[in-house]
Amino acid sequence: MNVDWPRFREVINAANNIVLTSHIRPDCDALGSCLGMAGILEALGKQVRIVCGQPVPENLKFIDPENRILCIDEDIEAKDFEDADLHIILDTSAWIQLGPMADVIRNSTYKKIIFDHHVGEDNIDAELFKNTTAEAVGRMCVDAAECLGVQLTPAISIPLFAAIATDTGWFRFNSVKEITYETAAKLLAGGAIPADIYRDLYERETAGRVRLRGTVLARIQTELD
């Protein structure tokens, strides 16, 4: 399925107050795509909020330094965005993956669209914008920026590079193709620094890791004594 980009542009141009949502148990493609899309839409003067069904996992908090991704019922309530006129669901086409946001979306009256690369879907009552050949929704977001005439900035490029890199196993999976590298190059030109993103993803010491290492070392010392 190919995205109808002229129709996508029409939908975006008609909206002013937009909510972005992705799936529970979020990964970098989900979170990075939400943040990248938020930057794209805000460049057009749109008001944007990101509201998901679960908090950002500890190991992925680096991707959202401004804490823009809100958790429903913890950081924000449904009544706080009743004034939205568009809800974009990214990186999923299934109710079950939306967690507590599913009922919020079901009960809402604003327009809903799905922006996704997965083949499977259920009966979410939303207009579909899907590219099932895309290796990541992050790549679709770059296409969206081009469709909407938005220049890639670091705030857009960094999360979208993380989205694509992680959903392709850091460019090792068979889903990687020529356009993947072309898109990655655009994101580098926009300000993404792969070495920094890789370090934040895989080499940063979390508090949990430090505590675990301390526990292991303490046990070793006890046994030696």
Protein language model regions, located:
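Active-site cofactor/cluster-binding pocket
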Residues: L70-E127
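Anionic-ligand anchoring segments at beta-strand to alpha-helix junctions in alpha/beta enzyme folds, i.e.
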Residues: I18-D83
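Divalent metal-coordination and catalytic microenvironments
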Residues: D27, M37, L60, I88, ...
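Structured helix-beta-strand junction loops
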Residues: A14-A15, E66, A84, S108, ...
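Amphipathic coiled-coil/heptad-repeat helices and related helical stalk/stem segments
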Residues: M1-F8, D73, Q97-L98
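Short phosphate-binding/catalytic loops that engage adenosine nucleotides
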Residues: K46, Y110, A192
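A structured phosphate/pyrophosphate-recognition subdomain
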Residues: N2-I24, G36-E42, D122-D225
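Short, glycine/charged-enriched secondary-structure capping and boundary segments
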Residues: S33-L35, I63-E66, M101-I105, E127-K130, ...
